[in-house]
Amino acid sequence: MTNAALDDKTIVRDYFNSTGFDRWRRIYGDGQVNFVQKDIRVGHQQTVDSVVAWLVADGNLPGLLVCDAGCGVGSLSIPLAQAGALVYGSDISEKMVGEAQQKAQEVLAYGNQPTFMTQDLAQLGGKYDTVICLDVLIHYPTEEASAMISHLASLADRRLILSFAPKTLGLTVLKKIGGLFPGPSKTTRAYQHKEADIRKILGDNGFSIARTGMTSTRFYYSRILEAVRS
C-alpha cells in the first residue's frame, strides 16, 4: 500500500468520524440541508433505489447473503434487509456504523436486522453471494481503487455491484471549476475513474458486466456497474 493510499484512508476515516459525519448524516437523512446537499441526497437515493430495484427484480432477494461495503448510515443495507436479504454492512467510520445500527433498529424493529461492523474494506473477509460498494471509490485514486475492487471481487461468489464518479471530459471540467471555489465541505479528495479502467479491473478478476446504470443530477454523478462471474 502506498503512502498516498494510506493518507487517503486516514483522511476518509477521520473526516467521517468528525465533521463529515454530521454533514453526511444530514444529507442521507431527511433534515434541513442546503440546495447542493439536497441535490446530492436525491442523487444518492436514486443510486440506492436503482440497485435495490435490480435485486428485487431478480426475484431471489429473500435469504440472499449480501455485503454492503462502505455502508455509511445504512441507506442501502436497511431496504435490502426489509426485502429479506441477509445483510452484512461495514464502514471505515465508527460513527457511521453507529448511526446505521440505530436507524436499522428504528426502521426494522424486531425484524431482519443487518449486521454492521466498523472495518476498512481491505479487512473484510467471508463469502457473499453479492457484494455491493456504492459511492466509496470516489474517495480513492485508481491504483488504490483497483486493489479494493480486486479484494471485494474475492468475497463475491456470484456478483459485484460498484458505483463510481465517471471520468469524462465534461465532468472533469465541472470538477475543476468547482475546485476554484473554496468551501468547508471540500475536506476529502474526490477522484473520478475511467469506466474502461473499472471494466478492465473487473474483467481481470473474472467478472463480466451484466447491467449498467447512471445517476445524474446537478451536483451528483454516479455510474453503476453490475458484474457477475464469467
UniProtKB/Swiss-Prot annotation:
Pathway: Porphyrin-containing compound metabolism; chlorophyll biosynthesis (light-independent)
GO molecular function, one term: methyltransferase activity
Catalytic activity from the UniProt record: Mg-protoporphyrin IX + S-adenosyl-L-methionine = Mg-protoporphyrin IX 13-monomethyl ester + S-adenosyl-L-homocysteine
EC number: 2.1.1.11
PROSITE patterns recorded: SAM_MT_MG_PIX (PS51556)
Pfam families found in the cross-reference section: Mg-por_mtran_C
A GO BP annotation: photosynthesis
Top EC group: transferase
Keyword annotations from UniProtKB, A to Z: Chlorophyll biosynthesis, Methyltransferase, Photosynthesis, S-adenosyl-L-methionine, Transferase
Family of the protein in this entry: Belongs to the class I-like SAM-binding methyltransferase superfamily. Magnesium protoporphyrin O-methyltransferase family.
Reported function: Converts Mg-protoporphyrin IX to Mg-protoporphyrin IX methylester using S-adenosyl-L-methionine as a cofactor.
Xref: NCBIfam families: BchM-ChlM
Protein name per its UniProtKB record: Magnesium-protoporphyrin O-methyltransferase
Organism this protein belongs to: Synechocystis sp. (strain ATCC 27184 / PCC 6803 / Kazusa)
